[in-house]
């Protein structure tokens, strides 16, 4: 049988109530929408069973499946250098966000998914001191993670996968430029050292490229292939990487080698969801931006 791409959507970018967002996603052709927290529904990490059931009913109403459940952005803003090795579980912010992540694990299957989302800590000063390590990271194609810091990451995510085993769910890590899994090499080292099949990745080729990783289509794909369960679909143009000068553009109109990536996914028969996002501005608004990216994605798929 010919390879069929599964298409999802990060519906927070639509800035619509969830009911309308799911309807829009379905209309645009995305069968696997997902969200982080909801303005009308509160924090996933503090959600009641009844609230979760209402959301599951909305998904059933539109005949769509939740790609993953995200309790906000667990660990995204925690500066790793401020976390003490050996006592990660006692760090106040980690402790709070870990509890939210565990609650998402408790709710995941109730809401129709077996995957929850997590992030991988901030590089030093990333959100507090204007990204002081960025020039070094760009020059080294993603940065250098010390053994001490990698050890902390491994400790943290071994705690996470212990809970994932308990609740029989997978944990998909994001690949943000501002976090430690900003490249496929960094993710692969962390995943291999944690050593759990529970750990997955929402691969972000655009973010990898934006961090200076040179070959996201082939070497990058090879690095993430054993772990990838979804792909963050957006495009960008890097103007001057050393000073973080880049522009988000419609899918297929930037620097990211998406044609090669989609081809490789099909050749490998990868069981992944293409999670459509935008990030660029459209004169007719957010839904129009998502429609533009969906149209471009479908055209590229048809051309393979």
Predicted feature descriptions by range:
Residues 10, 28-49, 70-81:
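N-terminal substrate-binding region of glycoside hydrolase catalytic domains
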Residues 1-8, 15-29, 53-60, 106, ...:
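Histidine-acidic metal/acid-base catalytic patches
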Residues 36-56, 120-127:
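Glycine-rich, proline-tolerant flexible connector loops at the mouths of alpha/beta enzymes
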Residues 31-32, 65, 114, 170, ...:
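Residue-level detector of anion-binding/catalytic polar loops
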Residues 34, 68, 117, 229-232, ...:
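Conserved beta-strand positions in the central sheet of alpha/beta enzyme cores
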């Amino acid at each position: 049988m010919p390879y069929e791409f599964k298409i999802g959507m990060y519906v927070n970018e639509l800035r619509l109530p969830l009911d309308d967002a799911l309807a829009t996603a379905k209309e645009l052709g995305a069968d696997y929408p997902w969200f982080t927290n909801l303005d009308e529904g509160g924090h996933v990490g503090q959600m009641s069973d009844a609230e979760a059931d209402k959301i599951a009913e909305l998904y059933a109403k539109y005949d769509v499946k939740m790609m993953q459940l995200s309790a906000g952005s667990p660990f995204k803003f925690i500066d790793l250098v401020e976390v003490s090795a050996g006592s990660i579980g006692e760090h106040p912010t980690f402790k709070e966000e870990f509890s939210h992540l565990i609650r998402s694990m408790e709710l995941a299957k109730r809401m129709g998914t077996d995957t929850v989302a997590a992030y991988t800590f901030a590089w030093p000063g990333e959100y507090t001191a204007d990204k002081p390590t960025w020039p070094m990271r760009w020059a080294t194609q993603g940065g250098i993670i010390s053994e001490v810091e990698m050890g902390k990451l491994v400790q943290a995510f071994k705690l996470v996968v212990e809970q994932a085993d308990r609740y029989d769910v997978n944990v998909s890590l994001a690949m943000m430029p501002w976090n430690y899994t900003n490249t496929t090499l960094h993710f692969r080292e962390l995943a291999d050292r944690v050593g759990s099949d529970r750990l997955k990745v929402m691969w972000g080729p655009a973010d990898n490229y934006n961090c200076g990783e040179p070959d996201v289509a082939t070497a990058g794909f090879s690095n993430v292939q054993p772990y990838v369960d979804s792909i963050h679909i957006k495009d960008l143009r890097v103007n001057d990487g050393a000073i973080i000068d880049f522009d988000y553009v419609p899918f297929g109109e930037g620097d990211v080698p998406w044609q090669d990536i989609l081809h490789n996914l099909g050749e490998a028969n990868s069981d992944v969801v293409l999670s459509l996002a935008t990030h660029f501005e459209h004169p007719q608004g957010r839904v129009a931006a998502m429609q533009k990216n969906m149209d471009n994605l479908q055209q590229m798929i048809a051309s393979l």
